[in-house]
Amino acid sequence: MTSTGKDGGGAQHAQYVGPYRLEKTLGKGQTGLVKLGIHCVTCQKVAIKIVNREKLSESVLMKVEREIAILKLIEHPHVLKLHDVYENKKYLYLVLEHVSGGELFDYLVKKGRLTPKEARKFFRQIISALDFCHSHSICHRDLKPENLLLDERNNIRIADFGMASLQVGDSLLETSCGSPHYACPEVIRGEKYDGRKADVWSCGVILFALLVGALPFDDDNLRQLLEKVKRGVFHMPHFIPPDCQSLLRGMIEVDAARRLTLEHIQKHIWYIGGKNEPEPEQPIPRKVQIRSLPSLEDIDPDVLDSMHSLGCFRDRNKLLQDLLSEEENQEKMIYFLLLDRKERYPSHEDEDLPPRNEIDPPRKRVDSPMLNRHGKRRPERKSMEVLSVTDGGSPVPARRAIEMAQHGQRSRSISGASSGLSTSPLSSPRVTPHPSPRGSPLPTPKGTPVHTPKESPAGTPNPTPPSSPSVGGVPWRTRLNSIKNSFLGSPRFHRRKLQVPTPEEMSNLTPESSPELAKKSWFGNFINLEKEEQIFVVIKDKPLSSIKADIVHAFLSIPSLSHSVISQTSFRAEYKATGGPAVFQKPVKFQVDITYTEGGEAQKENGIYSVTFTLLSGPSRRFKRVVETIQAQLLSTHDQPSAQHLSDTTNCMEVMTGRLSKCGTPLSNFFDVIKQLFSDEKNGQAAQAPSTPAKRSAHGPLGDSAAAGPGGDTEYPMGKDMAKMGPPAARREQP
């Protein structure tokens, strides 16, 4: 990795992997840290996954190599692309496609359950990409909304092929992996299984989640959850279209032999859709000419290494025998697919490199001398047209640059074993900025991460490498976590709260100061959540004490809403629906501020006040409905609720002041007391706040029951079998 900067105070540093400048941290996965990379010339954005070779076991590194080989096999518009691979002795860098829309999981949390039309769009794209993978004998085995990303146009990208496997012919898979919420019964039971059938089950669970906003199988107790999955009994909500219900039952089928195939799914009436909808995506043809390989010298070494890392071709002698066979077979098809990818996208040394001055910089994993289609070896590409620098940062003549390259500065490492001492990818000596083609230095964008390496006593930089994604440095603990994660996958990812890292966490290059990022998957921070959502309500001819009392009145009349007082004119509230699963239900947190619009302080008894509602976190749609309910009470011409409303909202309450100590006291008197408290506070008297009511009304302005949230949706019972639940009566279709 290269670090460039300017001497003197306020120096800015930039870390590079090849031509890509590293910026903010996007997330932390199971095997490495993921950072945003920007090309120093084209400004292309990529996601760079940094894998620490020294802190991961050999089996985990083999999984990373297998993921690289699988991503080379797949070229599909709805599969995340692998651009390049860089490496040095200590680190491996995967340069992946960057998408800005975030995870489908976060989209579902923010928007709630989707309309059948939007769900069909996403589902078609998932099936199209999965069909392409299966046609190349690749099974994903870890499909879930967290691993489905969205680009800027809300199109799907399937990501994270770390659990993927190559299933050749009629062979079956044995490894139990994935998340238990999306895993099929045969995987849960530990039986041999067909990876293609397992992916179909996972797609059925995902489709159910898109349409319902909840999972068909859910339980806080893992043992109970696994039993539910093995039984395969789930509740089918009434609002799902009948055609889609039959599709879901065919995909979420316990008997793998009766489970629908991708071919049947693509012919299903719901998948095809109506006349006014676009046609389903057609399969992408990919024809590769399979020819005979006369001898071992005709076999490309890079392709052979990639096939060996796939896992199912570990017997190298048998693989070579199959490749040299005159008959067409699966091995030859995969070989020529990888060879075709290598010939169409050759990996050569970079030419647009920034200045670098390191002992062991990241080197691009380039192609070895390979055979062309005519059986002749291509000359090895030796491009040395890159500006080199001395220790002081001055340019080096071209001849000396070539000499430095001959001493290992730009070795073509294929296996990853490179000479020289290990250097952290996150620190290196200062050098001058690399000039752009026009002669001016490249501007450093605002917000570029700054990292200043500490000086050792000898005056050499002390590298601070990123910590390993594994827990601790104990080998047995690493192995234990690997075994656990291989089966459970990410069982809590579907329950995690959407966390936005602080600016310090985003700019820091080491994950030690970013513990919250470890809870997110690789690409969980692609989506931009910095935009604030505010709603303003203007109130005239009401004193401040009355407005504050009305706000508290509205808070207490909404079931499952709690609040706290921040200051004289500010409140913080949280709406959290009770009785439903926490899968896609996120609490709404917001702040309420009261400001006087005609002066600095509210000194007048009556005037014009502005009440500002600011969304802090949670679904915006539910936030708007909560605010609409509060706004209706604030703008009401009557200070007191109607008699009918009072009869519906009468509760047993106690107030700390002792003014209300008997059950059955009307709520109107209760809020008169609140107004009096605020009035006393304004006059300088010590006010005592009433305690929270011990019981909330079962009827409120948001719905017919406490279980109905601002969205008007009846929540599913938590921890109860979905099969025992009757059809939701209060749930209504989305607009």
UniProtKB/Swiss-Prot annotation:
The active site is at D142 (proton acceptor). Residues 432-446 have a biased composition (Pro residues). A motif (KEN box) lies at residues 604-606. Residues 411-429 have a biased composition (Low complexity). GO terms for cellular component: centrosome; endoplasmic reticulum; perinuclear region of cytoplasm. Residues 298-340 form the UBA domain. Changing T175A: Prevents phosphorylation and activation by STK11/LKB1 complex. This is Serine/threonine-protein kinase BRSK2. Belongs to the protein kinase superfamily. CAMK Ser/Thr protein kinase family. SNF1 subfamily. It comes from Mus musculus (Mouse). Activated by phosphorylation on Thr-175 by STK11/LKB1. GO terms for biological process: actin cytoskeleton organization; axonogenesis; cell division; central nervous system neuron differentiation; ERAD pathway; establishment of cell polarity; exocytosis; G2/M transition of mitotic cell cycle. Detected in pancreas islets and in brain (at protein level). Detected in brain and pancreas. Disruption phenotype: No visible phenotype. Mice are fertile and healthy. In contrast, mice lacking both Brsk1 and Brsk2 show little spontaneous movement and are only weakly responsive to tactile stimulation: they die within 2 hours of birth. Defects are due to impaired neuronal differentiation and polarity. It comes from the Eukaryota. It catalyses: L-seryl-[protein] + ATP = O-phospho-L-seryl-[protein] + ADP + H(+); L-threonyl-[protein] + ATP = O-phospho-L-threonyl-[protein] + ADP + H(+); L-seryl-[tau protein] + ATP = O-phospho-L-seryl-[tau protein] + ADP + H(+); L-threonyl-[tau protein] + ATP = O-phospho-L-threonyl-[tau protein] + ADP + H(+). It is found in: Cytoplasm, Cytoskeleton, Microtubule organizing center, Centrosome; Cytoplasm, Perinuclear region; Endoplasmic reticulum. Residues 20-271 form the Protein kinase domain. Serine/threonine-protein kinase that plays a key role in polarization of neurons and axonogenesis, cell cycle progress and insulin secretion. Phosphorylates CDK16, CDC25C, MAPT/TAU, PAK1 and WEE1. Following phosphorylation and activation by STK11/LKB1, acts as a key regulator of polarization of cortical neurons, probably by mediating phosphorylation of microtubule-associated proteins such as MAPT/TAU at 'Thr-504' and 'Ser-554'. Changing K49A: Loss of kinase activity.
